[in-house]
Amino acid sequence: MHVLVADRLTCSRCGPEFGLILRADQTHDRRVTEGVLGCPNCRDQYPITDGFGDLRAPPRSELPKGLAGDPVIRTQDESEYLLPLLGITRGPATVLLIGGPTVLGPGLAALLDDIHVVGVDADLARWPTDPSWSRIVSHPGIPFFSRSLRGVVIDGRLDRHWFEEAARVIAPMSRVVVVNAVTTTSEWLQAAGLSIMANESGRVVATSS
């Protein structure tokens, strides 16, 4: 986990108004491989193990099955289509991938300088440590400050709450991209305050004002 990503994380128990304090036990090139993220409000601690951050609010049980699956190697070309959908041409930028799209994380991170890619999915705990991006799991929402991210790519198979959270965390004039979109996707995004830019071939692009 990159230290600049850790600075943007918030407490899943207390809510997005409460930032976390990083205790880095083991780092390399500004990446935390072992450590703890602590909340000064509720005193809860979120572990970072092998670079993977568990940002689930307590009580924490065994990790559930995610949507990313086993580790795979994807090329930059397979991730390239995301950049025009996100409307990002240069950094600095922090982009969040949730669910199935997290498999494109390393490829996306390699496309631009000064971009921080964060994947959110329980299956990423089994993925090897990769300095090009950050891996976390979270519950019940997205553990980032409101209006702080340049873009979110989200799996359309997820519950409505995740779409509301995606709308909350993107910065003004930024976009949410949905892959594996379903019939209710556009309705959910609009109800969350976003405007639909495109809806085609199982992908929906929405923007904040």
Outline where the language-model segments fall.
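Core SAM-dependent methyltransferase catalytic element
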Residues: 187-209
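A generic alpha-to-beta junction signature in SAM-dependent methyltransferases
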Residues: 89, 112, 168-172
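N-terminal auxiliary segments of SAM/dcSAM-dependent transferases
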Residues: 1-65
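A short acidic, Gly/Pro-enriched loop at the edge of an enzyme's catalytic core
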Residues: 92, 130-156, 160-164
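Conserved alpha-helix/loop element of class I SAM-dependent methyltransferases that forms part
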Residues: 21, 56, 66-94, 101-107, ...
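A short glycine-rich, Lys/Arg-flanked "PGG" loop and its adjoining helix->strand segment in the class I
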Residues: 160-177, 181-182, 186
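Short, polar loop motifs at secondary-structure junctions
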Residues: 100-104, 118-127, 181-184
